[in-house]
Swiss-Prot record:
GO cellular component terms given for this protein: early endosome; membrane; recycling endosome
Transmembrane segment boundaries: 64-84, 96-116, 130-153, 167-187, 208-228, 245-265, 288-308
GO terms under biological process: chemokine-mediated signaling pathway; inflammatory response; regulation of chemokine production
CDD domains: 7tmA_ACKR1_DARC (cd15010)
Extracellular compartment segments: 1-63, 117-129, 188-207, 266-287
Classification of source organism: Eukaryota, Metazoa, Chordata, Craniata, Vertebrata
GO molecular function, one term: G protein-coupled receptor activity
Annotated source species: Pan troglodytes (Chimpanzee)
Name of the protein this chain belongs to: Atypical chemokine receptor 1
Gene3D superfamilies in alphabetical order: Rhodopsin 7-helix transmembrane proteins
Protein's cellular compartments: Early endosome; Recycling endosome; Membrane
Gene designation: ACKR1
Amino acid sequence: MGNCLHRAELSPSTENSSQLDFEDVWNSSYGVNDSFPDGDYDANLEAAAPCHSCNLLDDSALPFFILTSVLGILASSTVLFMLFRPLFRWQLCPGWPVLAQLAVGSALFSIVVPILAPGLGSTRSSALCSLGYCVWYGSAFAQALLLGCHASLGHRLGAGQVPGLTLGLTVGIWGVAALLTLPVTLASGASGGLCTLIYSTELKALQATHTVACLAIFVLLPLGLFGAKGLKKALGMGPGPWMSILWAWFIFWWPHGVVLGLDFLVRSKLLLLSTCLARQALDLLLNLAEALAILHCVATPLLLALFCHQATRTLLPSLPLPEGWSSHLDTLGSKS
């Protein structure tokens, strides 16, 4: 948000010369004893002073980025191993191919977190930053769309239920996610050694498109799922979308979509913040929402593990075992 994002540092010589010039003009124009009260003088200086905000995710936040990345990679890798482990009960989890893609998306996000982290040097290129933002938002968009499909289609996503459905959804969802990342990929780069979104008049259309995409995927999609669930239940039209613990994923990205929309309105001057405190509060919310979104790469594998544990414990007694599982259990029974 303008100078609320980046504080302009003045050299001592510049500060001294500015102070001397101001004092000379003030004294020569009005004299030492002025008719204005001290309160008005201080208020005028405060109003004319630039509004500065402290960035929470600066170089001091590097340990947070690194720790989150490492934990996210380890947790996602563990979940993927359990999902693809032969003859393991998580493969009976409804829609497990979609769940595996969620873990892949979380792992991809965890990998690019250090690329966008501040404090790792000042030699990063714009191409690397654009690639980082592409994977960052692409994996998040794909995870949100996968959750929507998993909630809407439910048990029909199981292996062998509808031939080609899982493959078609995989290609379609990741393709749509890649298209949605084009605006942020083109509107991002390196500035002062940091990966950042570039705000300019020429890129305003790309910024608006990216903001709309975030609002649609992170805000409107979960609201639509909740609305459809409540409407179908109220009208007695069926169970509606399959509600599960996985819906907690949107808690990590919903604030990011909302605050990003507010920030775009302020930058476009469609929403005016008259006080410095309000602008500082918005900057703080942007940092907190980004930090919460980053934490999703650690929370997603935990949500997947909890969902698979609950689903297999509930559905395992009633599900028909695949042929390989039956022979495996028979072998174990004969040995005992």
